[in-house]
């Protein structure tokens, strides 16, 4: 869990990590003080952290505002070694509840706290990845990744794009999703009225002498109508991904 609170003069970021060997019962998602429980499958879930020596505690309830969107299977490798082989789905919705850390309690109103939830399974390059066999060769080049689950008043958008170092698309998924006022109104695991998109495009504007992005234009084209959808972004603050665990020096 990572909490990033942005105010007018400061930004507080704190993370809670927990891990253990998976047990025999797949529905038991308890790791020490952490618990993830499914309230209604593919609609709502609850995260609970009981009091522990990290100073973290809290309870958050997620409720879907959209149905789920399945992302394409992601596979990457170096030589004969698989670095990533995952399946994932994403759902956009509301979060409500509270978190407490550093002796400060923060309340989250579900009516104004919009966010996302994704679940993935498989091999991921965390904690060094798969250590079996000979050491992996140094990685040549890199990977370009854009992921944007977006909330608007009357719809949500999902934009995901992986490219290689030459700008060639590896994986992509684009969709415009209807929104619903309650989880009871969700039409099912997936929504048959979702507008699927292709031809994902991006235009990034970088700060001078920096790799920091200042503004972005994302675009995609509706498959059935051919209509091009363009969304513009301006930078508000910087989010540090390593706090979650990606390429973290210790976690």
Where are the model-predicted features located?
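Intrinsically disordered, low-complexity linker/loop segments enriched in Gly/Pro
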Residues: 29-145, 152
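A short, sequence-level motif marking secondary-structure junctions
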Residues: 7, 20-25, 62-67, 110-121, ...
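Single conserved hydrophobic/aromatic residue that forms the stacking wall/gate
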Residues: 1-7, 11-12
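Extended soluble regions of mature proteins
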Residues: 113-194, 206
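Short, exposed beta-strand/loop patches in secreted or surface proteins that constitute
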Residues: 18-22, 27-40, 204-209
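Compact, glycine/acidic-enriched structural inserts
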Residues: 13-30, 175-190
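Acidic/His-leaning functional-site neighborhoods
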Residues: 46-79, 168-251
């Amino acid at each position: 869990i990572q909490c990033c609170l942005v105010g007018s003069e400061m930004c507080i970021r704190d993370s809670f990590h927990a891990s253990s060997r998976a047990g025999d019962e797949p529905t038991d998602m308890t790791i020490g003080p952490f618990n993830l429980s499914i309230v209604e499958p593919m609609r709502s879930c609850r995260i609970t952290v009981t009091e522990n020596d990290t100073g973290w505690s809290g309870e958050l309830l997620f409720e879907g505002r959209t149905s789920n969107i399945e992302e394409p299977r992601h596979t990457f490798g170096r030589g004969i070694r698989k670095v990533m082989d995952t399946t994932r789905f994403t759902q956009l919705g509301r979060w409500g509840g509270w978190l407490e850390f550093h002796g400060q309690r923060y309340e989250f109103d579900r009516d104004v706290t919009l966010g996302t939830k994704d679940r993935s399974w498989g091999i991921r390059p965390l904690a060094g990845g798969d250590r079996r066999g000979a050491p992996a060769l140094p990685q040549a080049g890199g990977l370009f990744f854009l992921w944007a689950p977006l909330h608007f008043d009357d719809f949500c958008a999902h934009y995901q794009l992986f490219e290689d170092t030459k700008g060639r698309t590896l994986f992509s998924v684009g969709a415009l999703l209807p929104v619903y006022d309650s989880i009871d109104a969700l039409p099912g695991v997936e929504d048959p009225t979702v507008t699927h998109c292709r031809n994902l495009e991006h235009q990034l504007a970088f700060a001078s002498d920096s790799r920091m992005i200042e503004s972005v234009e994302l675009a995609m084209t509706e498959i059935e109508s051919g209509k091009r959808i363009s969304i513009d972004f301006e930078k508000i603050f910087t989010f540090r991904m390593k706090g979650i665990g990606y390429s973290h020096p210790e976690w």
